[in-house]
């Protein structure tokens, strides 16, 4: 057959496909001729950042990805971790940033759909979801619209699909004005012997298309996700996919039923770059070629070209290599669920990716060079600058700490996210033990009497901007700490690395140092990275986002009756600070929100201290010594105890300590927790802390209806609650954004 070429391949067309001149020359050298238009689209999709990780691959290899519980690390649709009794948890986090800015509802909804597919493609039934959302400053004209659309999209898809949203984050910063971030996490449960991978095995086997029909939605989506935005952003709306959670629910049930039948050899969901990426990955991983016949692809639009079919990112679709003798059984299962089932090709032994449309060969390419041997860059990078030290004595104090506390707890970044999570179904499936609003979400493991899992997602972007290395460490440490604060043992993590343009050495430097920090923390805390995603080119008109390496993690609770949450304080309990008093105000919320300053270094993360203090806290929780626990992060001690008071509906009378009041109250030193315990248990905790070398201070007693800290803070729990709960609903109702 001759290869037809439907369009002239011009320099403008090459540039429009996101390919650099040297990359196009590499294509010419590789195939010895000019590519067809369809082939150009295939190379564009497979060689962009979104699919190939060409700028980050070198550095991602340095991350720790193995451990005694790790069954499957990076490289598959999701990571797999052993939780005992033949069970495993399957999880991943992934970005849907660019589509969510252009079309917030569908962008966020299909982000949720995509991550759920990644999990059930592995053979796991999804049991939990989270989402980490970053928006522009509240008074930016688009922020309210984007928040509303994204939250509705996340809830609309997750609720209809039937998975509980158990946690997440919402932040606001002007650096996200032109590029919001939507990072979606999902976890599922499977049996050890029920894990399915994407590596095709065997020659001449049928390649089967499953799920919804193919349309033109999302054509070029992966390429768009690898580019900066500019003034033409609205023109990119057609590249956003449209999701249908009910079809996805049917796809889940059909896939799990088919997997149980023993028919599946390999399976890959169609995400970024659709049919192209899924077929190439399956073949390249198995050292096989793939031949596709596009005339057999189920379509929902007329006159679709080969280019459009290969690059469509229509949702709720899978590609599978099937045992031939199981074909009729497989078809019957998918027909029963009202889904398309079509044999669209076969595996071959020639390592070629061949695409046939209307009797013509429109693509014939070396499959390994598209897949696991795609280009890889060692981009130049600059060491990020360091901030000068900032002693607390050089940071101004406020006249009224009660007013300061009310302002901070009612601020955009620290106020309650109830407005967000009440739009999500947090209880569906009936296993949720701790819902959003605490340190981590907790769910029971179905079919097990006592076992539970904890989930958290964390990063502090302003720390990463000030010091990407310490910021990367801190993201891991805080995720580990939040999981620990429930009494769970952190098992493993997934990363979602959101950065600007890697072609700028200063941005590449942020990425390199953040990965270095993440790796160091994961090694020290035995918290390996088992899956992840990189999202680069998050810039608009040259303005990059804050570096945002989101870390999500999973922890195991052997007995869910021995857990802690932030709202468990009882009258008469003693509060104990574990980890020492605050001294560090550099890059703090106190400095930023009260004085509009972003100076000083990010707090240093002492990983040995993190591990020692965290293991001590976990032991106390599991031994039944603790009635409530909260880790310290943004806003320090004052915010932590205020949140505990609000969630418990109880006041407390606490000692202010001996340090500078603003540092003790609002310092953001790491590796710290506040625990509540009965008076007797608090004595035991203090005694044990002394023996373990864990710094501690007995803060005071729970009771009354006000939070009193020495003679510097005296605020009623009712006023704290009003401030905490009031900001978000007020903002979304259209009230002017105030500084309180």
From Swiss-Prot:
Active site: 50, 96 (proton acceptor)
Keywords assigned by UniProt, alphabetized: ATP-binding, Cytoplasm, Ligase, Magnesium, Metal-binding, Nucleotide-binding, Purine biosynthesis
Stored Pfam families: AIRS, AIRS_C, FGAR-AT_linker
The UniProt record lists the keyword Kinase: no
GO cellular component terms, semicolon-separated: cytoplasm
Recorded superkingdom: Bacteria
Functional description taken from the UniProt entry: Part of the phosphoribosylformylglycinamidine synthase complex involved in the purines biosynthetic pathway. Catalyzes the ATP-dependent conversion of formylglycinamide ribonucleotide (FGAR) and glutamine to yield formylglycinamidine ribonucleotide (FGAM) and glutamate. The FGAM synthase complex is composed of three subunits. PurQ produces an ammonia molecule by converting glutamine to glutamate. PurL transfers the ammonia molecule to FGAR to form FGAM in an ATP-dependent manner.
Alphabetized PANTHER family for the sequence: PHOSPHORIBOSYLFORMYLGLYCINAMIDINE SYNTHASE SUBUNIT PURL
Protein's name according to its UniProt entry: Phosphoribosylformylglycinamidine synthase subunit PurL
Gene source species: Brucella anthropi (strain ATCC 49188 / DSM 6882 / CCUG 24695 / JCM 21032 / LMG 3331 / NBRC 15819 / NCTC 12168 / Alc 37)
């Amino acid at each position: 057959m001759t290869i037809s070429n439907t369009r002239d391949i011009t320099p403008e067309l090459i540039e429009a496909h996101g390919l650099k001149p040297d990359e196009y020359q590499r294509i010419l050298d590789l195939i010895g001729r000019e590519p067809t238009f369809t082939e150009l689209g295939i190379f564009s999709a497979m060689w962009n950042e979104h699919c190939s990780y060409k700028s980050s691959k070198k550095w991602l290899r340095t991350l720790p990805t193995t451990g005694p519980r790790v069954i499957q690390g990076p490289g598959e649709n999701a990571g797999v971790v052993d939780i005992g009794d033949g069970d495993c948890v399957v999880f991943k986090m992934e970005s849907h940033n660019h589509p969510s800015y252009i079309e917030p509802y569908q962008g966020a909804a299909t982000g949720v759909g995509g991550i759920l597919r990644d999990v059930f493609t592995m053979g796991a039934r999804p049991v939990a979801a989270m989402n980490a959302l970053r928006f522009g400053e509240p008074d930016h004209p688009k922020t309210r619209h984007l928040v509303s659309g994204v939250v509705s999209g996340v809830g609309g898809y997750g609720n209809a699909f039937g998975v509980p949203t158990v946690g997440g984050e919402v932040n606001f910063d002007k650096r996200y004005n032109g590029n919001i971030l939507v990072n979606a996490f999902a976890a599922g449960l499977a049996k050890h012997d029920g894990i399915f991978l994407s590596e095709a095995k065997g020659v001449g086997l049928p390649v089967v298309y499953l799920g919804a029909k193919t349309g033109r939605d999302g054509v070029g989506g992966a390429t768009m996700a690898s580019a900066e935005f500019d003034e033409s952003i609205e023109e990119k709306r057609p590249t956003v996919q449209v999701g249908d959670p009910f079809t996805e629910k049917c796809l889940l049930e059909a896939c799990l039923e088919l997997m149980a039948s023993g028919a599946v050899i390999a399976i890959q969901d169609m995400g970024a770059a659709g049919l192209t990426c899924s077929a190439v990955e399956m073949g390249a991983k198995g050292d096989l070629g793939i031949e596709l016949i596009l005339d057999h692809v189920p379509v929902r639009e007329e006159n679709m070209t080969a280019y459009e079919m290969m690059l469509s990112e229509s949702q709720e679709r899978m590609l599978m290599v099937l045992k031939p003798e199981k074909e009729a059984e497989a078809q019957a299962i998918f027909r029963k669920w009202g889904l398309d089932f079509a044999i669209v090709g076969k595996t071959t032994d020639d390592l070629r990716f061949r695409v046939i449309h209307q009797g013509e060969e429109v693509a014939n390419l070396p499959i390994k060079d598209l897949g696991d041997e795609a280009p890889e860059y060692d981009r130049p990078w600059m060491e990020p600058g360091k901030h000068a030290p900032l002693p607390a004595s050089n940071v101004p104090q406020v006249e009224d700490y009660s007013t300061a506390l009310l302002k901070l707890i009612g601020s955009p970044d620290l106020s309650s996210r109830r407005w967000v999570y009440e739009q999500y179904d947090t209880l569906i499936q009936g296993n949720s033990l701790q819902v959003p609003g605490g340190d981590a979400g907790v769910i029971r493991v179905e079919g097990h009497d006592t076992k539970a899992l904890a989930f958290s997602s964390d990063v502090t972007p302003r720390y990463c901007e000030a010091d990407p290395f310490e910021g990367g460490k801190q993201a891991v440490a805080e995720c580990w700490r939040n999981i620990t604060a429930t009494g769970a043992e952190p098992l493993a993590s997934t990363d979602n690395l959101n950065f600007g343009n890697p072609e700028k050495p200063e941005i590449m430097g942020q990425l390199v140092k953040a990965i270095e920090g993440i790796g160091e923390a994961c090694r020290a805390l035995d918290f390996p990275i088992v899956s992840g995603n990189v999202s680069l080119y998050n810039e608009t008109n040259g303005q990059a986002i804050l570096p945002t390496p989101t870390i999500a993690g999973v922890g195991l609770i052997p007995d869910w009756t021995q857990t802690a949450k932030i709202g468990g304080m009882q009258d008469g309990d003693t509060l104990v600070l574990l980890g020492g008093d605050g001294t560090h105000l550099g890059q703090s919320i106190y400095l930023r929100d009260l004085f509009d300053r972003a100076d000083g270094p990010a707090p240093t993360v002492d990983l040995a201290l993190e591990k020692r203090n965290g293991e001590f806290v976990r032991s106390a929780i599991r031994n039944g010594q603790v009635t409530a626990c909260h880790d310290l992060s943004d806003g320090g001690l004052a915010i932590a105890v205020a949140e505990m008071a609000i969630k418990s509906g109880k006041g407390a009378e606490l000692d202010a300590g001996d340090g500078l009041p603003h540092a003790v109250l609002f310092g953001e030193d790491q590796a710290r927790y506040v625990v509540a315990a009965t008076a007797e248990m608090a004595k035991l905790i203090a005694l044990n802390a002394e023996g373990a070398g864990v710094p501690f201070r007995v803060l005071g007693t729970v009771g009354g209806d006000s939070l009193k800290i020495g003679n510097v803070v005296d605020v009623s729990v009712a006023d704290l609650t009003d401030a905490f709960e009031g900001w978000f609903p007020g903002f979304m109702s259209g009230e002017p954004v105030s500084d309180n």
